[in-house]
Amino acid sequence: MSKSTAEIRQAFLDFFHSKGHQVVASSSLVPNNDPTLLFTNAGMNQFKDVFLGLDKRNYSRATTSQRCVRAGGKHNDLENVGYTARHHTFFEMLGNFSFGDYFKHDAIQFAWELLTGENWFALPKERLWVTVYETDDEAYGIWEKEVGIPRERIIRIGDNKGAPYASDNFWQMGDTGPCGPCTEIFYDHGDHIWGGPPGSPEEDGDRYIEIWNIVFMQFNRQADGTMEPLPKPSVDTGMGLERIAAVLQHVNSNYEIDLFRTLIEAVAKVTGATDLSNKSLRVIADHIRSCAFLVADGVLPSNENRGYVLRRIIRRAVRHGNMLGAKETFFYKLVGPLIEVMGSAGEELKRQQAQVEQVLKTEEEQFARTLERGLALLDEELAKLQGDTLDGETAFRLYDTYGFPVDLTADVCRERDIKVDEAGFETAMEEQRRRAREASGFGADYNAMIRVDSASEFKGYDHLELNGKVTALFVNGKAVEAINAGQEAVVVLDQTPFYAESGGQVGDKGELKGVGFTFAVNDTQKYGQAIGHLGKLSAGALKVGDVVQADVDEARRARIRLNHSATHLMHAALRQVLGAHVAQKGSLVSDKVLRFDFSHNEAMKPSEIREVEDLVNAQIRRNLPIETHIMELEAAKAKGAMALFGEKYDERVRVLSMGDFSTELCGGTHARRTGDIGLFRIISESGTAAGVRRIEAVTGEGAMATVHAQSDRLNDIAHLLKGDSQNLGDKVRAVLERSRQLEKELQQLKDQAAAQESASLSSKAVDLNGVKLLVSELAGVEPKMLRTMVDDLKNQLGSTVIVLATVVEGKVSLIAGVSKDVTGRVKAGELIGMVAQQVGGKGGGRPDMAQAGGTDAAALPAALASVQDWVSAKLQ
């Protein structure tokens, strides 16, 4: 009996654990501190800084099953998903990694043992082929002489993509960053399937399928194309879980493995589909994986960056559900089946199930409102189409009006063998794309980040002032030996009390001082293992090797500590009041305010806000001790410490607890006791995206300032109402009641005046072939009174056509009324349109009543004068 996908995942991790590898959890799909990536798209992403020498781990061998998304940017598989056997937006990458430990020999031997060993995957050796980079004689020799693969099954691949190092067997993540030659392992499905070995003209067939890529990480590619040797040669491997599952389960398509079979059946159930071979089922089964995990990792549908990619995938899935005949929202119903089939890899998704379902349901409902109209428009355009290409302007209109991503339009067209003029679409989109490029940091040069080889020791938990030695200086991102007065720079010290921005807490400010110089620090940031002090040298000169006195702004740090501790209390209080589904989605802890984004599907009620505020203040009054303990990550989680999903933690972590009320992993700075916070007040609660709420709050002196400000406002209002703050509510209610009474009396007077005006107007009507025509501009009449006046005049005049106008603050308001017996000849909508056009406006309505507005008041007299001739012509 073949292994399930979950069993294959576990077997891979168990094998490498037995070879001394640390099993590391999958990182978030949102890359941590990497400006070059839209999404995590490979197992090595979370180790990129390790390969570059910017980060250190307490292990030199690691293994992971990494969640990946490829649906945007360079690695974009979206358009092929559902139409091929192996393309996915979401997949799991099994990998083993060596950080300066083993290299080519062990990497190849490990792979061979796992794939062919009787106790592991037990694949037939004669079915395996390998490729190596053309000049990598070492890897070739290991495969031939040590593993024993015949030469005819070892293929050298050169630079087959038109440039040096541009090869299927030379791996690089992007234009810059870690790279190196690789060896790939292929599985031969047999001669009953069409296709040839890698490097042959038939290599695109499905017979020979790549199952494992082993990269020998030797270089860091610079922006100018040069290759710098990495500090230590390393190994990065990747094997798609879905691909190896297809091989081990003896199927030729990833969509036939147990995981996808289960999901496809679930899709069929919620959409009512009966043909399990329908490609739309495959599309939706794939897309629920990427969408659910992206939302769980904090990405929300939007019109930019990651949120837009998510929106595109959701909408593509919804459109395919529509094709299958789904009559109601269905996509969110697949989250439950997905959690079941993912096993241990779906634990975080299970914790956030309600939140993920709500986000997907809301997005589907929003799109469903425009999907039908958009598809109707597209059908119209395709019916009129002459040729085989839809113009870019129509594709843009579908995007702009109905929210159709261009790839969704292309998807519909593809089914009818029609192409989309994507160049024309891009032209129409250029202005929006230009703005998006300016706002986005994605695609930046990874090497543009300051690279510091040294490390800084942070001593700010216990010290706000100490001496440190300058180990590096940077001006405009480039290392320098010295700076002079007036220059802005980044100063790196061997040890520092300054806290670098992390975990939502802002970086410290202060001064670096010495004999004859002062450097004003206005921010502190991390650069790998180093801490950089950003600021300006206000006096003197500073050079590498100098000793400085580092002084943190103590008062500012104190306010930050209070706000950070209050954030932890509020997080715990929110979970108590709203439920365990509350999860942090973002935070800002500054000296002035704390801001906390969290998952929750509706606005908080005033009573809930008050309850959270009261609960936090109760913990402040308890004056709980705030304690920190350093322990192993798994032990901390076992103790119940909350870890922020997507945050990167070391194996040993800092656990911060506040009595029995809150326990979290946190590297920030905090008060000593909760009583130090003094007072906590929530100043706003709002929504930032579907399923995400935001609270802003203040503490200590800031909280007292809001109390005083509120008291001052109440006293000001009481003074205006000639009362005091004790009976303010009664006073305001009395004023509002009196105001309502006066408004009612005023309306009655206006109605009487309108009736009198109508009576006097009726005498001004002229007779046109038995129809009374009344055209008049009224001064000092509110626009909303015109309709009442037209109704009164109709009753008085019998067979009639009426046009009334008024001008308020330079804007023209028009109304036309036509008695029922005349609407066959004169239609109010046409009449009002003719008049409105002359005053720079437009309008419409029913044949017997129509309204319009305009902006050209000066043209009104002439427009009204034209009515009689227009009506006369209609009455002929």
UniProtKB/Swiss-Prot annotation:
One of its GO terms (biological process) is alanyl-tRNA aminoacylation. The keyword Aminoacyl-tRNA synthetase applies. One of its GO terms (cellular component) is cytosol. It is an enzyme of class 6 (ligase). Gene3D superfamilies: 2.40.30.130, 3.10.310.40, 3.30.54.20, 6.10.250.550, Bira Bifunctional Protein, Domain 2, Threonyl-trna Synthetase, Chain A, domain 2. GO terms for molecular function: alanine-tRNA ligase activity; aminoacyl-tRNA deacylase activity; ATP binding; tRNA binding; zinc ion binding. Coiled coil: none annotated. Zn(2+) binds at residues 564, 568, 666, 670. CDD domains: AlaRS_core (cd00673). Its cofactor is Zn(2+). SUPFAM superfamilies: Class II aaRS and biotin synthetases (SSF55681), Putative anticodon-binding domain of alanyl-tRNA synthetase (AlaRS) (SSF101353), ThrRS/AlaRS common domain (SSF55186), Translation proteins (SSF50447). It comes from the Bacteria. Keywords: Aminoacyl-tRNA synthetase, ATP-binding, Cytoplasm, Ligase, Metal-binding, Nucleotide-binding, Protein biosynthesis, RNA-binding, tRNA-binding, Zinc. Its main location: cytoplasm. It catalyses: tRNA(Ala) + L-alanine + ATP = L-alanyl-tRNA(Ala) + AMP + diphosphate. It is found in: Cytoplasm. Binds 1 zinc ion per subunit. Its EC number is 6.1.1.7. Catalyzes the attachment of alanine to tRNA(Ala) in a two-step reaction: alanine is first activated by ATP to form Ala-AMP and then transferred to the acceptor end of tRNA(Ala). Also edits incorrectly charged Ser-tRNA(Ala) and Gly-tRNA(Ala) via its editing domain. Homotetramer. NCBIfam families: alaS. Consists of three domains; the N-terminal catalytic domain, the editing domain and the C-terminal C-Ala domain. The editing domain removes incorrectly charged amino acids, while the C-Ala domain, along with tRNA(Ala), serves as a bridge to cooperatively bring together the editing and aminoacylation centers thus stimulating deacylation of misacylated tRNAs. Belongs to the class-II aminoacyl-tRNA synthetase family. This is Alanine--tRNA ligase. It comes from Salmonella arizonae (strain ATCC BAA-731 / CDC346-86 / RSK2980). The lineage of its organism: Bacteria, Pseudomonadati, Pseudomonadota, Gammaproteobacteria, Enterobacterales. The gene is alaS.
